[in-house]
Amino acid sequence: MNKKIRVRYAPSPTGLLHIGNARTALFNYLFARHHGGDFIIRIEDTDRERHVEDGERSQLENLRWLGMDWDESPETHENYRQSERLPLYQKYIDQLLTEGKAYYSYKTPEELEADHAKQEAAGIAPHYINEYAGMSDDEKAAYIAERKAQNIEPVVRISVDEKAIYKWNDIVKGDIEFEGKNIGGDWVIQKRDGYPTYNFAVVVDDHDMQISHVIRGDDHIANTPKQLVVYDALGWEAPQFGHMTLIINSETGKKLSKRDTNTLQFIEDYRKKGYMSDAIFNFIALLGWNPGGEKEIFSREELIELFDEHRLSKSPAAFDQKKLDWLDNEYIKNADFAKVFELTKPFLVAANRFDERAEELVKLYQPQMKSADEIVELTDLFYGDFPELTDEAREMLAAETTPLALSTFRAKLAELPENDFTVENIFPLFKATQKETGVKGKMLWMPIRIAASGSMHGPELPETIALLGKEKVLAHLDAALNK
């Protein structure tokens, strides 16, 4: 690539960072870093009605948490928010008006709605009908004067050549073309409040910031021909476009929707649950891109080195919550204990469980956790009531050899002094019980695990027994023997 690579992530501060937007940011970041280019953050805040307080801060904070950095942003550069760039937009709107490539439109929202209703009733796709069509200059002047007298504020529309073909070679999808007649007619580039519309402002911004590539979701494909209209009108070279496929829910096969409250979709949600940022970064990087091979766990450095925009998938990317949980568990299992302990601390504190056993409990459950917040539920045994047994667990306790195995193991535990109730001293008791009773394998370990912890699965049993403490374990074993 001869041209300096400059890409941007340009969120609207209208809410939290969605997983889909995070993917857009991440792919642009990987693309820029792989090619030694610039990654730019720009805030598109022209939609004042949907503006959310702290929306910008939330976007940047969560991108930073994911491990991304950037070369230019509103934090370091002036006029990187669209609301600060209004004079620049006005300059080019005035240029288009002067050149006759744009014009003031006085049709009211009610009139436009009525036009669209008639078109729909006739089976025609809604499109703008030029209000000046067929008017003489005098008629046009009289019409404008009448509208001004009624205090109707105009919008500015750009003229669309309906005979033109707008085409581009998409990085992901290959050659795409749109007929001008399908754009929907002359469209608004400046609203009544003086703010530019998205499709106009984004072109001015991308040109002004020398953006070389625009990589975004394929819900923007319909915006691209509109933006090409502006590039042509202003005589500018368009960047190269790439449109990533949709993200779908792996269980339903439907587009991932913010209205789907059963699926966590915001980066903030994963932060609050104690997921590791490295795992989320890794997971998102594989949503619609794959370097090939069977490997699924990559460091940020590996992803930057391997990233190839030509391997972006043409098929929808499946968001699989189970896969994400598996990945986070892998990261937690292999992370430094100090990092995992720090991650679990807020949850232990909130549950009033940050006591002298906290470190040992986190060590015990580190291999099991799919997210740090699970430490509370996992440690319920140590702080709450004995769990309700499953039918399968009850069947195991009802086995013919269970009473002998439990009573023998219980007697040996009881002989251990309180100060010697450690993993090193507990572990040999299993072998001693096996030798004395002849009960071995699953028929020995499983009833003891169920009786001591209430579960058929869990962390290392000797460690669990040691942390529960002698008094509690003996009480649990007695309860099982007396049933």
From Swiss-Prot:
Keywords of this entry: Aminoacyl-tRNA synthetase, ATP-binding, Cytoplasm, Ligase, Nucleotide-binding, Protein biosynthesis
Gene Ontology CC annotations of this record: cell surface; cytosol
InterPro entries xref list: aa-tRNA-synth_I_cd-bd, aa-tRNA-synth_I_codon-bd_sub2, aa-tRNA-synth_I_CS, aa_tRNA-synth_I_cd-bd_sf, Glu-tRNA-ligase_bac/mito, Glu/Gln-tRNA-synth, Glu/Gln-tRNA-synth_Ib_cat-dom, GluQ/Sye
CDD domains to which the protein is assigned, alphabetical: GluRS_core
EC number: 6.1.1.17
Domain of life: Bacteria
Protein species of origin: Lactococcus lactis subsp. lactis (strain IL1403) (Streptococcus lactis)
Official protein name in the record: Glutamate--tRNA ligase
